[in-house]
Amino acid sequence: MGDPICKWRSATPRNVVELVSSLPHTEMSEEDFKETIENKWPGFLHTPYQLACQLGLYVVNNGIYTPRFSHDINETEAKAYLEDIVTRYYVPNPYTPRGFKNIKKPIVLEKAIVNYIESNPNETELKKIIGLLIMEEVGNFSSIKTFLSNSNVLDITKENVSLKP
Protein backbone atom coordinates (compact mmCIF):
# COMPACT_ATOMS: atom_id res chain seq x y z
CA MET A 1 0.00 0.00 0.00
CA GLY A 2 1.38 3.39 -0.99
CA ASP A 3 0.73 6.57 0.97
CA PRO A 4 1.06 9.48 -1.48
CA ILE A 5 0.96 11.92 1.45
CA CYS A 6 1.32 11.39 5.19
CA LYS A 7 -1.66 11.04 7.48
CA TRP A 8 -0.74 13.47 10.26
CA ARG A 9 -3.24 16.15 9.20
CA SER A 10 -4.73 17.23 5.91
CA ALA A 11 -2.96 19.69 3.65
CA THR A 12 -5.35 22.58 4.24
CA PRO A 13 -4.56 26.30 4.38
CA ARG A 14 -5.25 26.32 8.13
CA ASN A 15 -2.77 23.50 8.79
CA VAL A 16 -0.14 25.09 6.53
CA VAL A 17 -0.50 28.35 8.48
CA GLU A 18 0.03 26.41 11.72
CA LEU A 19 3.11 24.62 10.37
CA VAL A 20 4.69 27.78 8.95
CA SER A 21 4.05 29.75 12.15
CA SER A 22 5.74 27.00 14.16
CA LEU A 23 8.81 26.71 11.95
CA PRO A 24 11.81 29.01 12.40
CA HIS A 25 11.89 31.65 9.65
CA THR A 26 15.67 31.89 9.30
CA GLU A 27 18.32 29.55 8.04
CA MET A 28 20.25 27.72 10.78
CA SER A 29 22.15 24.56 11.49
CA GLU A 30 20.13 21.35 11.55
CA GLU A 31 21.08 20.92 15.21
CA ASP A 32 19.76 24.40 16.12
CA PHE A 33 16.59 23.74 14.11
CA LYS A 34 15.89 20.49 15.94
CA GLU A 35 16.41 22.13 19.32
CA THR A 36 14.28 25.17 18.39
CA ILE A 37 11.37 23.18 16.96
CA GLU A 38 11.33 20.63 19.79
CA ASN A 39 11.17 23.48 22.32
CA LYS A 40 8.34 25.15 20.40
CA TRP A 41 6.45 21.97 19.38
CA PRO A 42 7.46 18.84 21.29
CA GLY A 43 7.04 15.81 19.05
CA PHE A 44 7.19 17.80 15.81
CA LEU A 45 10.02 15.64 14.49
CA HIS A 46 8.02 12.44 14.95
CA THR A 47 5.14 13.02 12.50
CA PRO A 48 4.24 16.67 11.74
CA TYR A 49 7.61 17.20 10.06
CA GLN A 50 6.60 14.77 7.29
CA LEU A 51 3.77 16.95 6.00
CA ALA A 52 5.90 20.09 6.33
CA CYS A 53 8.66 18.45 4.29
CA GLN A 54 6.27 16.90 1.76
CA LEU A 55 4.79 20.32 1.13
CA GLY A 56 8.23 21.90 0.80
CA LEU A 57 7.83 24.16 3.82
CA TYR A 58 11.45 23.53 4.75
CA VAL A 59 14.45 21.47 3.76
CA VAL A 60 17.52 20.25 5.59
CA ASN A 61 20.48 19.85 3.28
CA ASN A 62 24.10 19.30 4.27
CA GLY A 63 23.24 20.03 7.90
CA ILE A 64 21.54 23.36 7.13
CA TYR A 65 17.84 24.05 7.77
CA THR A 66 16.27 26.38 5.19
CA PRO A 67 12.64 27.54 5.54
CA ARG A 68 10.34 28.20 2.57
CA PHE A 69 8.91 31.29 4.26
CA SER A 70 10.76 34.02 6.13
CA HIS A 71 7.56 35.18 7.83
CA ASP A 72 4.25 33.90 9.15
CA ILE A 73 1.62 33.51 6.46
CA ASN A 74 -2.16 33.87 6.49
CA GLU A 75 -4.75 31.47 5.08
CA THR A 76 -4.92 33.35 1.76
CA GLU A 77 -1.16 32.93 1.27
CA ALA A 78 -1.36 29.31 2.39
CA LYS A 79 -4.16 28.61 -0.09
CA ALA A 80 -2.15 30.16 -2.93
CA TYR A 81 0.88 28.11 -1.87
CA LEU A 82 -1.15 24.86 -1.85
CA GLU A 83 -2.62 25.69 -5.27
CA ASP A 84 0.94 26.04 -6.54
CA ILE A 85 2.55 23.06 -4.82
CA VAL A 86 -0.22 20.65 -5.87
CA THR A 87 0.87 21.22 -9.49
CA ARG A 88 4.39 19.97 -8.67
CA TYR A 89 3.74 17.28 -6.07
CA TYR A 90 5.24 13.99 -7.09
CA VAL A 91 4.91 10.38 -6.03
CA PRO A 92 6.84 8.74 -4.58
CA ASN A 93 7.78 11.56 -2.28
CA PRO A 94 11.01 11.03 -0.30
CA TYR A 95 9.10 11.56 2.95
CA THR A 96 6.64 8.71 2.27
CA PRO A 97 8.93 5.71 2.00
CA ARG A 98 6.25 3.00 2.27
CA GLY A 99 5.14 1.34 -0.91
CA PHE A 100 5.67 2.52 -4.48
CA LYS A 101 7.80 -0.49 -5.41
CA ASN A 102 6.23 -0.65 -8.89
CA ILE A 103 6.86 2.96 -9.91
CA LYS A 104 9.94 3.15 -12.12
CA LYS A 105 10.19 6.94 -12.07
CA PRO A 106 8.33 9.57 -10.02
CA ILE A 107 5.07 10.96 -11.38
CA VAL A 108 3.70 14.47 -10.92
CA LEU A 109 0.38 13.40 -9.46
CA GLU A 110 -1.94 16.20 -10.63
CA LYS A 111 -0.57 16.05 -14.18
CA ALA A 112 -0.83 12.25 -14.26
CA ILE A 113 -4.47 12.42 -13.11
CA VAL A 114 -5.29 15.03 -15.76
CA ASN A 115 -3.64 12.92 -18.47
CA TYR A 116 -5.49 9.82 -17.28
CA ILE A 117 -8.87 11.56 -17.29
CA GLU A 118 -8.24 12.98 -20.77
CA SER A 119 -7.44 9.46 -22.04
CA ASN A 120 -10.21 7.75 -20.03
CA PRO A 121 -13.07 10.27 -19.74
CA ASN A 122 -15.52 7.67 -18.44
CA GLU A 123 -13.39 6.84 -15.39
CA THR A 124 -14.15 9.22 -12.55
CA GLU A 125 -13.35 7.29 -9.36
CA LEU A 126 -10.40 9.16 -7.85
CA LYS A 127 -9.12 6.34 -5.63
CA LYS A 128 -9.13 3.91 -8.57
CA ILE A 129 -7.32 6.39 -10.82
CA ILE A 130 -4.61 7.07 -8.24
CA GLY A 131 -4.27 3.33 -7.59
CA LEU A 132 -3.74 2.71 -11.31
CA LEU A 133 -1.17 5.50 -11.48
CA ILE A 134 0.85 4.37 -8.45
CA MET A 135 0.27 0.71 -9.33
CA GLU A 136 -0.91 -0.33 -5.87
CA GLU A 137 -3.62 0.28 -3.31
CA VAL A 138 -3.83 3.89 -2.15
CA GLY A 139 -3.13 4.56 1.52
CA ASN A 140 -4.33 7.68 3.35
CA PHE A 141 -6.86 8.35 0.61
CA SER A 142 -8.70 11.08 2.52
CA SER A 143 -5.42 13.00 2.97
CA ILE A 144 -4.45 12.87 -0.71
CA LYS A 145 -8.03 13.71 -1.72
CA THR A 146 -7.97 16.80 0.51
CA PHE A 147 -4.58 17.82 -0.88
CA LEU A 148 -5.74 17.40 -4.49
CA SER A 149 -8.81 19.53 -3.74
CA ASN A 150 -6.37 22.48 -3.82
CA SER A 151 -5.99 21.93 -7.56
CA ASN A 152 -7.23 24.58 -9.97
CA VAL A 153 -7.77 21.98 -12.71
CA LEU A 154 -9.36 19.06 -10.84
CA ASP A 155 -12.92 19.07 -9.53
CA ILE A 156 -13.26 16.57 -6.70
CA THR A 157 -16.74 15.68 -5.52
CA LYS A 158 -17.12 12.94 -2.92
CA GLU A 159 -15.17 10.01 -4.41
CA ASN A 160 -15.09 11.30 -8.00
CA VAL A 161 -12.82 13.55 -9.99
CA SER A 162 -13.26 15.46 -13.23
CA LEU A 163 -11.53 18.29 -15.02
CA LYS A 164 -12.70 21.80 -14.25
CA PRO A 165 -14.08 23.64 -17.28
Tell me the role of every PLM-derived stretch.
Residues M1-P165:
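Donor-sugar nucleotide-binding helix/loop cap in glycosyltransferases
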